[in-house]
């Protein structure tokens, strides 16, 4: 009995030990599985954060930095280079300011929302302000392109009337109108504000929702994109047609032999044979022999024979500029069309997949942002003066080149009282030695007075003989 009891006790003890061992093994195995699961989740989280960081770095390097840097170069070039300070380039400067503000205030915050998975990470009051700046600067960039195309077409179609209004003050008025139109399109965003989730105010996505901004999305797409697009396309084809027509007329114009009697207006030198010096004289039958001495006839005719060549060269340069403008329009369509078409579809299509459309908008808006970085490249790399300025600014050289400084010095040295022959001799002796080529030279009369507004008036520069094509190319705007 005692022996049986001892055997039973030993058996119970063995079973208890075995049970505890099994329980320990099960707990250990379960703990190991949970540990592996946690480690796997942590690994996936780290990998997800790594992908987000890589995506952010790619956007910063490929889009934001070039946008900021390129537009700063454009602003510096127009502000510092005297040769670039004319009305058309002030439009470019304003366009560069709009694109620069996109790179400084819009793109970084948009990138921040990507890193936080579309959750607004900043104070809620800043959300409407950021949306307003986004719409404002992007619209201003598009409106500047539209205004440039209109201004260019008018300048080619009616050059005399356009040149009369082509002052700095007029350019600033046009730029102000462009910014006011952009503000008018974007102002409904901060007025209406965004709809806040009362239950969870920290889980807010900063975006224009269909329920609250549906009508604005339709209006904004039409006013900020499709209307300017229509204007740009129409003016572009009208510009091409006008240039082709002018090129045809110049090409098929019968050659004319210029004589001393075919020149309606010339700038005269100060001559001792006259009682009072005349700068500009209208030629009539009673004074022709006095005003144009026979000794200068051949020189005058040689200078006037280049007018036709310069007209053809100018039209050729305008055609090349229009091709560059075509590249700008093509890139504009390529970069902004997907966003605005998707935005319009999201506002009008109730049966469409809203989640898919919102995802597409997040992608397409960055393609539109790229346009702000491309604009300064396309508009300025076709211009030699911009390229030279960019090269100096990149090397932190913000001073004018030696040739430009010398040109300013010679411009102040050459006087109106001297004859054209005397000024030409002075320039030939000193100008080439200091690095000034004939294409860079402008007569004191042109530097002092504005362009005479008449198709029958011809301005005789001091040097217009050998490098006429280069001079015309340098004077024609490539915008």
Curated annotation (Swiss-Prot):
Keyword Isomerase: no
Cellular compartment(s): Cell membrane; Synapse, Synaptosome
Residue ranges annotated as motif NPxxY motif: 375-379
Phenotype of null mutants: Partial embryonic and perinatal lethality, due to heart ventricle hypoplasia and impaired proliferative capacity of heart myocytes. Mutant mice that survive into adulthood have a decreased heart weight relative to body weight. They display dilated cardiomyopathy with a loss of ventricular mass, due to a reduction in the number and size of cardiomyocytes. The myocardium from mutant mice displays abnormal organization of the contractile elements, with an irregular array of sarcomeric myofibrils and abnormally wide Z bands.
One Gene Ontology term, aspect cellular component: neuron projection
Disulfide bonds: 127-206, 349-352
Task performed by this protein: G-protein coupled receptor for 5-hydroxytryptamine (serotonin). Also functions as a receptor for various ergot alkaloid derivatives and psychoactive substances. Ligand binding causes a conformation change that triggers signaling via guanine nucleotide-binding proteins (G proteins) and modulates the activity of downstream effectors.
Protein name according to UniProt: 5-hydroxytryptamine receptor 2B
Lineage: Eukaryota, Metazoa, Chordata, Craniata, Vertebrata
Gene that this polypeptide is encoded by: Htr2b
């Amino acid at each position: 009995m005692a022996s049986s009891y001892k055997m039973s006790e030993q058996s119970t003890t063995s079973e208890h030990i075995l049970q505890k061992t099994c329980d320990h093994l099960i707990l250990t195995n379960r703990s190991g599985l949970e540990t592996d699961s946690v480690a796997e989740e942590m690994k996936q989280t780290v990998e997800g954060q790594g992908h987000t960081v890589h995506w952010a770095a790619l956007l910063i390097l490929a889009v934001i930095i070039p946008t900021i840097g390129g537009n700063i170069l454009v602003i510096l070039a127009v502000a510092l280079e005297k040769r670039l300070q004319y009305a058309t380039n002030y439009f470019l400067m304003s366009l560069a300011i709009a694109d620069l503000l996109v790179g400084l205030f819009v793109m970084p915050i948009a990138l921040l929302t990507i890193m936080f998975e579309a959750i607004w990470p900043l104070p809620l009051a800043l959300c409407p302000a950021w949306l307003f700046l986004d719409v404002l600067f992007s619209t201003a960039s598009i409106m500047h392109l539209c205004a440039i195309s209109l201004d260019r077409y008018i300048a080619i179609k009616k050059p005399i009337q356009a040149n009369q209004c082509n002052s700095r003050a007029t350019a600033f008025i046009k730029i102000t109108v462009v910014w006011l139109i952009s503000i008018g399109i974007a102002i409904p965003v901060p007025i209406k504000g965004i709809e806040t989730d009362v239950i969870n105010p920290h889980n807010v996505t900063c975006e224009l929702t269909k329920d609250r901004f549906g009508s604005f999305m339709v209006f904004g797409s039409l006013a900020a994109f499709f209307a300017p697009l229509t204007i740009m396309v129409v003016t572009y084809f009208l510009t091409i047609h006008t240039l082709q027509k002018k090129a045809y007329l110049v090409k098929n114009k019968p050659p004319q032999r210029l004589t001393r009697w075919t020149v309606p207006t010339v700038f005269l030198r100060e001559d001792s044979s006259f009682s009072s010096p005349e700068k500009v004289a209208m030629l009539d039958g009673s004074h022709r022999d006095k005003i144009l001495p026979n000794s200068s006839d051949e020189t005058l005719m040689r200078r006037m024979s280049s007018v036709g060549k310069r007209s053809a060269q100018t039209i050729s340069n305008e055609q090349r500029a229009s091709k560059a403008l075509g590249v700008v329009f093509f890139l504009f369509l390529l970069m902004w069309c997907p966003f605005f078409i998707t935005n319009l579809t999201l506002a009008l299509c109730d049966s469409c997949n809203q989640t898919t459309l919102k995802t597409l908008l997040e992608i397409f808006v960055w393609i539109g942002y790229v346009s702000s970085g491309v604009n300064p490249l396309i508009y300025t790399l076709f211009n030699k003066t911009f390229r030279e300025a960019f090269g100096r600014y990149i090397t932190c050289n913000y001073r004018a080149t030696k040739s430009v400084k010398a040109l300013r010095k010679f411009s102040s040295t050459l006087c109106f009282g001297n004859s054209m022959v005397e000024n030409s001799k002075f320039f030939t002796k000193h100008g080439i030695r200091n690095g000034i080529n004939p294409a860079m030279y402008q007569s004191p009369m042109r530097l002092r007075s504005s362009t005479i507004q008449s198709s029958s008036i011809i301005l005789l520069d001091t040097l217009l003989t050998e490098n006429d094509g280069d001079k015309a190319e340098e004077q024609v705007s490539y915008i």
